[in-house]
Amino acid sequence: MSTADLRLRWAIALLLAAAGAAAEDTCDRNEFRCRDGKCIASKWVCDGSPECPDGSDESSETCMSVTCQSKEFSCGGRVSRCIPNSWRCDGQTDCENGSDEQGCAPKTCSQDEFRCQDGKCISQKFVCDQDQDCVDGSDEAHCQAATCGPAHFRCNSSACIPSLWACDGDDDCEDGSDEWPQNCGGRDTAAAWSSSPCSSLEFHCGSSECIHRSWVCDGSADCKDKSDEEHCVTATCRPDEFQCADGTCIHGSRQCDREYDCKDMSDELGCINVTQCDGPNKFKCHSGECIALDKVCDSMRDCRDWSDEPIKDCRTNECLDNNGGCSHVCKDLKIGYECLCPNGFQLVDQHRCEDIDECQEPDTCDQLCVNLEGSYKCECRAGFHMDPHTRVCKAVGSVAYLLFTNRHEVRKMTLDRSEYTSLIPNLKNVVALDTEVANNRIYWSDLSQGKIYSALMDQAPTLSYDTIISGDLQAPDGLAVDWIHGNIYWTDSVPGSVSVADTKGIRRRTLFQEKGSRPRDIVVDPVHGFMYWTDWGTPAKIKKGGLNGVDIYSLVTEDIQWPNGITLDIPSGRLYWVDSKLHSISSIDVNGGNRKTILEDEKQLAHPFSLAIYEDKVFWTDVINEAIFSANRLTGSDVNLVAENLLSPEDIVLFHNITQPRGVNWCERTALPNGGCQYLCLPAPQINPHSPKFTCACPDGMLLAKDMRSCLTEVAPVLTTQGTSTIRPEITAGAEGLPKHKEDQSASSTSRQPALSTVESVTMSHQVQGDRRNEERPQGVGVLSITLPIALVILLVFGAILLWRNWRLRNINSINFDNPVYQKTTEDELHICRSQDGYSYPSVSMPFCGREEAASKLKDRS
């Protein structure tokens, strides 16, 4: 090989090496190159959190060159960051320098709104209503005595209510004066109302609620009026006993013994349990003593076994030999050594440091968590943007509103209270609430009316309400809307049921009903096909099941007493609920794991009723405090008062498009409308990739046909009638628009069941079971009329056979022959039958003998 060839090859090798080195120093197009050469994602540059080890991704030189997009606002300043334009002048500071809330024009209130002194707008109806709705109280200043119209009743507190609400057995005035006997013609309307839906195992509060009887006189008020703690005899404990917070007594030695002996766990509160030799300045001898660390290796025996003075280990630095075998940091001790790890790493096998996956903790980040070597990174889902100031994922899009019930109305309020109005006024006793954001529609249930209503949000103040469900409702305490498939779900605590209907109320079905259960609130996840509801029956629980009513089971059964409101944070996949007895807010993932108590407070959670989740906040209503509070949904900190001076606030929902993500309605993706279902098409739970997308359902009392789409009702059979005609069981279709299905008929006459129309199907579905019960008695009579004659005939035949056999035995002579050789009686019997002419010999059949041989043998024997 020539010298020129060698030089050429060396040049090519050098070029390839240089290209490889350059490639290593070059980051991808969507990456940012730190000063030390490390590559990070470009979206992490100037986001307020340094990802480069040298911090170059957050330096002022780097961030000053960032250009915001047209839909973004530049915070400016030393570090220019970008935020969505919708966050500009929204009442919340998002830029570190506050520039997004500077130079904002004062909010302009509409004609039907009142402007508070702090610039916030509230509904004109809230002015001089004896409730302070402005934070500064300016809406109740300079008010004159209220004058009620002719169609209104004036409460003793001067408030006005519709006359129809007076003397109806339900307190509508805050002081209850609308039900006083002197205002109701001397009638005691409370007596008529005393027949409450409380069971024998429940206590009826003076404020009309039902609570467990075991909660009476337990030291904690559970009724709104605290009537469950009136006239209680307080237990007195002996001097050597400890009194629990609920009044019970335990032996004094059981306090602070690291075991819960009180039901309320108060015996372990405030205990300080110190373990010997804990702390870096303590040394535990092998013989059990505990000495100060400075006495180790001081050439003095302080331990009985001299374990504090090992000659070999004292003054020996093991870290000098191969770093002590430690992968990162080796720390020499007076006796021995220990391996240490930097932040973001944990020690495994006593020597090696391993990266900590912080993302395994469910609440490490607000939404998404990206694990990095020795660290982690928080990100936001689509539709959210990271707030550079608070590091919280904030929703991008329309303005978020809180909608909540206030007994006689539904109110609407922005999170910063800049807008506060009455959305649906003049209601009787609204309890449950939910919305359909895409259609701008609101749904609510009225406990006094026993109905479920609906209205468009922009038309809600008018009287154009749609009645969705108007029959067979007793206590519809919970309501949830499936915004993907167009269905509503509700609970009824009196029959203990969970039901579903389409949003027009035409088709309806009971999915769950159990004796002793008290379903309260319900939430749905139509994206994955599940529903969850609280049940404060005995025992209390949280249940989970498919939206089609299948695979229902208890998700939470421990440390739960009075679960009330429940909500679902779909982005994080976690359930949140309030417990009115435990005064707590808790969360758990949708599979029942990673449970966490977020907040526990008897004052701010005196009687929580419902809750809602939005961004990093949890909002809840409290009927005793008559207020709405908020707190951080991850830590329970930063508790704030959102609204106060309310009248029995119960349900609360958050209205924003991000709370109801889009999904696929598989019932409309098939060639046949409504998924080919004759009645209801309900989404199926997506338990695994092979799960069906939906299943068909029928009204109560009807069954699916073999095609699993049509609905059938079975007519009670009447097998015999007068004459020769027979009537066979018939199965007919139970809804309009599809052909009837019948069993094969061979009878000369049949009875028909009228087909259900789509309008009448709901009513019919609830009558079918009653009709069946009414038919049980005639059906039993028909069965008896068939079986008794058959039994008599069988007895007669059996008796005749016995009589014939008895007569036959009396008229037959049997002769046995003894064999003299074997001394054995033969088994052959000769029957000589008596006839009119004397005796006759029947033909004899003998084994292995023909007829002639048998005849000859008979002659020989004779």
Curated annotation (Swiss-Prot):
Modified how: N- and O-glycosylated. Ubiquitinated by MYLIP leading to degradation.
InterPro entries attached to this UniProt entry: 6-blade_b-propeller_TolB-like, EGF-like_Ca-bd_dom, EGF-like_dom, EGF-type_Asp/Asn_hydroxyl_site, EGF_Ca-bd_CS, Growth_fac_rcpt_cys_sf, LDL_receptor-like_sf, LDLR-related
Sorted UniProt keywords: Cell membrane, Cholesterol metabolism, Coated pit, Disulfide bond, EGF-like domain, Endocytosis, Endosome, Glycoprotein, Golgi apparatus, LDL, Lipid metabolism, Lipid transport, Lysosome, Membrane, Phosphoprotein, Receptor, Repeat, Signal, Steroid metabolism, Sterol metabolism, Transmembrane, Transmembrane helix, Transport, Ubl conjugation
Extracellular side: 22-782
Principal subcellular localisation of the protein: membrane
Domain of life the protein comes from: Eukaryota
Region (Disordered): 729-760
Bilayer topology annotation: Single-pass type I membrane protein
Name this polypeptide is given: Low-density lipoprotein receptor
Organism name: Cricetulus griseus (Chinese hamster)
